[in-house]
Amino acid sequence: MALLDFFLSRKKSTANIAKERLQIIVAERRRGDNEPHYLPQLKRDLLEVISKYVQIDPEMLSVQLEKKDGDISILELNVTLPETEETTK
């Protein structure tokens, strides 16, 4: 019976298709808006300051902003510093 229903089923209306597409677009935009616009510049500035003191690969710096419970934001900064070879005196 399912096979018969498949062949006799009506096509989705264009309104339903448009609604589904809009829901997908809205969901993608909400997901993409989590990162503030200033975060890439903040990462560049931090990299510039750290580079004054230590040679560091840009891939070794990670900056993430996580929002929790509406009002709370957590800025996470991970820096992997290169190992230094200490010379004995």
Swiss-Prot record:
Q: Which Gene3D superfamilies match?
A: Cell division topological specificity factor MinE
Q: Work out whether the entry's keyword set contains Metal-binding.
A: no
Q: Which UniProt keywords apply?
A: Cell cycle, Cell division
The free-text function statement in the UniProt record for this protein reads:
Prevents the cell division inhibition by proteins MinC and MinD at internal division sites while permitting inhibition at polar sites. This ensures cell division at the proper site by restricting the formation of a division septum at the midpoint of the long axis of the cell.
For this chain, the family text in UniProt reads:
Belongs to the MinE family.
Query: Which lineage ranks, top first, belong to the organism behind this chain?
Result: Bacteria, Pseudomonadati, Pseudomonadota, Gammaproteobacteria, Enterobacterales
Sorted alphabetically, which SUPFAM superfamilies does this protein's record hold?
Cell division protein MinE topological specificity domain
The species this protein was found in: Sodalis glossinidius (strain morsitans)
Its domain of life reads Bacteria
Query: By what name is this protein known?
Result: Cell division topological specificity factor
Q: Which InterPro entries match?
A: MinE (IPR005527), MinE_sf (IPR036707)
User: Would the keyword Aminoacyl-tRNA synthetase be found if you checked this record's keyword annotation?
Assistant: no
